[in-house]
Amino acid sequence: YLIAHSRDVCLTRKKDLYFPKRFCEGLAMISHQNAAIIDTISAIPRQTILDCETPLIQLHALSSHLDIDLWMKRDDVAGPSFGGNKARQLEYYFGAACDKQADTILITGAIQSNFVRLAAACAVRFGMKAIVQLEERVAKSDPTYQQSGNVLLNHLLGADILYYPEGEDENGADDTLYAEAEKLRAQGRTPYVIPLSESKPPLGALGYIRGAAEITSQTTDPFDYVITGSGSGATHLGLAAGMKIYCPSARVIGSCVRRPKAAQASRLRHLTGSFNTLIGCPDFLSEDDIHLWDDALA
């Protein structure tokens, strides 16, 4: 079988069409429902962050060792400031922020979050101030962990840094950002919050519908499986929807990175409803489309 894998997301492939580059031909070859979904997504504000398609490469040595045809989608090189797969998600969050004429973005994540660091870099690109909230998710971390890596880059990118002590309290972390946003509004600023908790629609998941279209445009044979990390759930849901549109024979499997399979399944069930509403098709993704694996969770 065929598998494609990236640092944060693993994917599988099948041939179909990529929008917007092949938008017209794609509409001619997919169902009316799928075409309506693409039409809905195309009307949602988006800011370009990826300058080009990311590579899809075959892993010859691993393929031979495992006796499979294994590929990797290199979304680790997507976007500015050392890249990362969250660039696809941020295209839609910054699309919404620019549409609202925001001058400040607020985001929360782990202390060494790539998502947070990439958001800070994108804020510079779009002329916005970044306020990043770093959550204490690692017990007894040393000063190097607290100050180096992405934390240092956040400082260099000019972000204001806040700290939140409860690393697994997503609703509380979001509430703190919304309270900070209200303070900014009182000062005449226009903030935009990029939320983390499952209580908000996963807007960033739309980026991986486009990502699935890109994958299928780069290959001539269909993949059987797509394997992705499943944490917040946005990348996982976007790929599940995108492959259902462009490569319905492929099974998307989420490898749990933060919580056991049962807890992650509950989270994704909750997010699926708001995601389906977002794409204008209330019954598009169902529990049958969500597959999880947690054997490597530690």
Write out the residue ranges for each language-model feature:
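A composition/secondary-structure signal for short, hydrophobic, low-basic-content segments
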Residues: Y1-I3, N85
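PLP-dependent amino-acid enzyme catalytic core
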Residues: E25-A298
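N-terminal cationic leader/targeting segments used for protein routing and processing
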Residues: K15-D16, R22
